Amino acid sequence: MASRGINKVILVGNLGNDPEIRYMPNGGAVANITIATSESWRDKATGEQREKTEWHRVVLFGKLAEVAGEYLRKGSQVYVEGQLQTRKWQDQSGQDRYSTEVVVQGFNGVMQMLGGRAQGGAPAMGGQQQQQGGWGQPQQPAQQQYNAPQQQQQAPQQPQQQYNEPPMDFDDDIPF
C-alpha cells in the first residue's frame, strides 16, 4: 500500500484575539482565530531564560465555528486538531500572496476548550469534551464534542458508558 502522507496539526495554546465569525452564503459558520504557542529554554552561552512565541492562523467551520464564537475569548486556552493548508490569493495590486492556516473541519477536525471559566462566564468544557478515554476512562461518542453547555445541563440522559481497559492477563509467577 503506497502512503500518500499525513497532514495533521495539533496545537495547544492561547487565543491572541476574540474569534472573528462570519457566515457563508449557505449559512455555514466560519471562525478565524489566532493561537499563540510558546516554548522556553535556557541559553547555554548566557544562562538566560529565553522564550519564543509562534502565532498560528486557525480556521474553524460549521458547529465548531459557532461554539468558538460563543465561548472562546482572547486569552482562552484551546486544543485544536486540523490540517495545514496554504491558500494563494491576489492583493489589490495584483501580487500573488500566500496564507498558511490550520483548517479545522469535518471528521478530522477537533476543538476543545481547556482551562477554567473565562472572565465572560463561559463554562469550562475541557473535561466534558474528551472524545476518547484512556485505560479505565469512558469513551464518549464523538458528537458530544460539539454540544453546547445548555444541552449538557438538560436532563441527565447519558448513553451507557463503554470502558477501554487493557486485557487482564497477568502472570503471578514473575520472579520480581
Curated annotation (Swiss-Prot):
InterPro entries: NA-bd_OB-fold (IPR012340), Primosome_PriB/ssb (IPR000424), ssDNA-bd (IPR011344). Disulfide bonds: none annotated. Residues 120-162 have a biased composition (Low complexity). Residues 6-111 form the SSB domain. GO terms for cellular component: nucleoid. PANTHER family: SINGLE-STRANDED DNA-BINDING PROTEIN. NCBIfam families: PRK09010.1, ssb. HAMAP family: SSB. Plays an important role in DNA replication, recombination and repair. Binds to ssDNA and to an array of partner proteins to recruit them to their sites of action during DNA metabolism. This is Single-stranded DNA-binding protein. The gene is ssb.
